[in-house]
Design a protein with these regions (language model features):
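Electropositive, gly/pro-rich neighborhoods at or near active sites that engage anionic ligands
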Residues: 1-199
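Helix-loop module immediately N-terminal to the HCX5R catalytic loop
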Residues: 214-235
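Glycine-rich anion-binding loop/nest that anchors nucleotide
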Residues: 183-185, 237-251, 264-266
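C-terminal functional extensions of proteins
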Residues: 247-322
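Short, acidic/turn-prone active-site loops that include or flank metal/cofactor-
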Residues: 205-212, 266-271
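Structural signal for conserved beta-strand scaffold positions within catalytic alpha/beta enzyme cores
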Residues: 90, 183, 204-207, 264
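Short, surface-exposed connector motifs at secondary-structure boundaries
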Residues: 175-177, 231-239
């Protein structure tokens, strides 16, 4: 079982990843593509590295009452299983090919930020916004992924692959070739939008939204999390798009186990309905600024000219030295 101590993952190119996804969808074979970020790191690193500040971070996702040690431990175990079971795992660009001091997570927040800012592939404007706790989560992500026992057959790609699927039109082409689509999302309007746009049958399993943003939607963890598995009753071979935060990675594994093709598309769901939940990604990846503005080309609706002129990714990370 390979280990990548410097996060030197042999990643597929974006076109290779997209082709692998298209093949899995066409073959209707059990499949899971998930993406890992600093939020997943907090849960994966629960046993040995979690701190009170990490629990506070999870409060923003699931609410104060939802973040109990028992609940986090439960999801941590399930998430590890999901990571081991994924066919393709999306890895952040900025942690690749980096070696960090073994004791880094035991240092002060400011010291962690200093090391992360110097060693990780982070753009200067991001460094200026990076908090000590944000830096710690990136360091924790590196620690977790660099010590994980990966499967021999697992493949890796960019954690931004969902945006490439969207911007290149590949996701549209995939949806135009299927008849049934499952959705795991907090956005009830998506089912009808996708059905009308692509002339497909949709089935939706609803999840609560991020607690900090929409507290009235309820707590995702632990209550809803524990009931969702029984609702993932899509037929074998069905393409299921998942955008459900940290628990969504687990749902991808459960879907794969039931014979589905599960793709973690995350914030693509937000873009489809015109919500710019990742404005920094829109700006850094596509050169699009404007706060809450999502460009028309990224939203669901009638077909648009596919010439992606301003949707071509314009940024590739470079190492920044202080």
């Amino acid at each position: 079982m390979p280990i990548y101590p410097a996060c030197e993952f042999p990643r597929l190119s974006d076109p290779e990843t997209i082709e692998t996804v298209i093949t899995a969808v066409g073959n209707k074979e059990p499949f899971s593509l998930i993406r890992l970020g600093d939020g997943e790191a907090v849960v994966l690193g629960f046993d040995e590295d979690i701190q009170l500040q990490d629990l506070a971070y999870l409060h923003t996702h699931w609410g104060t009452e939802g973040v109990t040690l028992r609940a986090v431990a439960e999801i941590s175990n399930d998430l590890r299983t999901a990571v081991r079971g994924a066919d393709i795992v999306g890895i952040r660009d900025d942690i690749l090919n980096v070696t960090i001091p073994p004791d880094l997570l035991n240092r002060s927040g400011n010291e962690i930020k200093k090391v992360v800012s110097k060693e990780f592939r982070i753009r200067q404007d991001e460094i200026e916004r990076l908090s000590p706790m944000g830096a710690r989560r990136l360091a924790l992500l590196h620690r977790v992924l660099s010590t994980f026992n990966w499967g021999d057959e697992q493949q890796f790609c960019s954690a931004w692959i969902h945006w490439e699927l969207l911007a290149t039109g590949a996701l549209n082409r995939i949806l135009e070739e299927v008849r049934d689509v499952g959705l795991v999302t907090s956005r009830p309007e998506l089912g009808e939008l996708i059905a009308q746009r692509f002339d497909v049958r949709t089935s939706t399993v609803l999840t609560p939204d991020k607690f900090m943003e929409v507290p009235e939607s309820g707590r995702h963890v632990p209550e809803r999390y524990r009931t969702i598995r029984s609702e993932l009753t899509f037929s074998k071979g069905t393409l299921v798009l998942v955008g459900a935060g940290i628990p969504g990675k687990v749902y991808c594994q459960w879907l794969k186990e039931s014979g589905c093709v599960a793709i973690d598309v995350g914030s693509v769901f937000d873009a489809w309905v015109g919500k710019a939940s990742r404005p920094r990604v829109l700006e850094s990846r596509f050169g699009i600024s404007g706060g809450d503005l999502v460009p028309r080309e990224l939203q669901l609706g009638p077909p648009v000219n596919p010439e992606s002129r301003r949707l071509i990714p314009k940024w590739k990370p470079t190492r920044v030295s202080n």
